Structure formats: C-alpha cells, structure tokens
C-alpha cells in the first residue's frame, strides 16, 4: 500500500467512526427518554398501588357517596376518572377535564 491508499483508508475509517458516534449519541438520547418515562410510570404505579391498598383496607362501600368520594380523591391525585381516559395521568393538574367533571358532579 502506498501512502495515498493508507490515507484514504484512514479517512474512510474516520468517517465511519463519526457516523457510529452519531448513532451511539442518538441511542443514548433515546435510552434517556425511555428511562425517564419508566421512572414516571413507576411512580404512578406506586401511587396507584398505595391508593388500591387504602381502598382495600376500607372494605366495600356502605353508602352510595363513598364511591363518589373515592373517584374525587383519585381525580384530585391527578388521574382521569372518565370512561374515555380512565386511569391515565392528567397532563396538567390545574386544567379540568370536562368528562371527569361531568361524572363527578352528575346527580
């Protein structure tokens, strides 16, 4: 191999290395996003399990108002109680969900 061929091979190797580095960075970014989402979901899961434990300890509801109170507590904890989005976390706790409110305040 002459010097020119060695230089070209080294240049090609360098370009391939740069592309591989860019791919690794993209994978790292994606992994970070997945880990963050996983953490949020684990926290939600823990909160829901805690809530379920509280509900199971209280036993079956004796009055019709207790079910509504439980739904209201779940809603105030930041979760949807409407049939369309039940159990999903509300994006913004300050914003009200019209479907959930209709269910809560229905007579």
Swiss-Prot record:
Names of required cofactors: Zn(2+)
InterPro entries in the cross-refs: YabA
Entry annotated with the keyword Transferase: no
Entry keywords, A to Z: Cytoplasm, DNA replication, DNA replication inhibitor, Metal-binding, Zinc
Entry binding sites for Zn(2+): 80, 82, 97, 100
GO terms under cellular component: nucleoid
A Pfam family the protein falls into: YabA
Cellular compartment(s): Cytoplasm, Nucleoid
Bound cofactor: record note: Binds 1 zinc ion per subunit.
GO terms (BP aspect): DNA replication
Quaternary structure annotation from Swiss-Prot or TrEMBL: Homotetramer. Interacts with both DnaA and DnaN, acting as a bridge between these two proteins.
Role according to the record: Involved in control of chromosome replication initiation. Inhibits the cooperative binding of DnaA to the oriC region, thus negatively regulating initiation of chromosome replication. Inhibits the ability of DnaA-ATP to form a helix on DNA; does not disassemble preformed DnaA-DNA helices. Decreases the residence time of DnaA on the chromosome at its binding sites (oriC, replication forks and promoter-binding sites). Tethers DnaA to the replication machinery via the DNA polymerase beta sliding clamp subunit (dnaN).
Family: Belongs to the YabA family.
Protein name as catalogued: Replication initiation control protein YabA
Gene: yabA
């Amino acid at each position: 191999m002459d010097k020119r061929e060695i230089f070209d091979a080294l240049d090609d190797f360098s370009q391939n290395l740069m592309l591989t580095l860019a791919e690794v960075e993209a994978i790292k970014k994606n992994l970070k996003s997945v880990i963050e989402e996983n953490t949020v979901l684990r926290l939600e899961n823990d909160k829901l399990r805690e809530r379920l434990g509280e509900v199971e300890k209280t036993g079956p509801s004796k009055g019709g108002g207790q079910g509504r109170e439980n739904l209201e507590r779940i809603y105030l904890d930041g979760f949807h109680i409407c049939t369309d989005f039940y159990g999903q976390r509300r994006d913004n706790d300050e914003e009200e969900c019209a479907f959930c409110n209709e269910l809560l305040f229905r007579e």
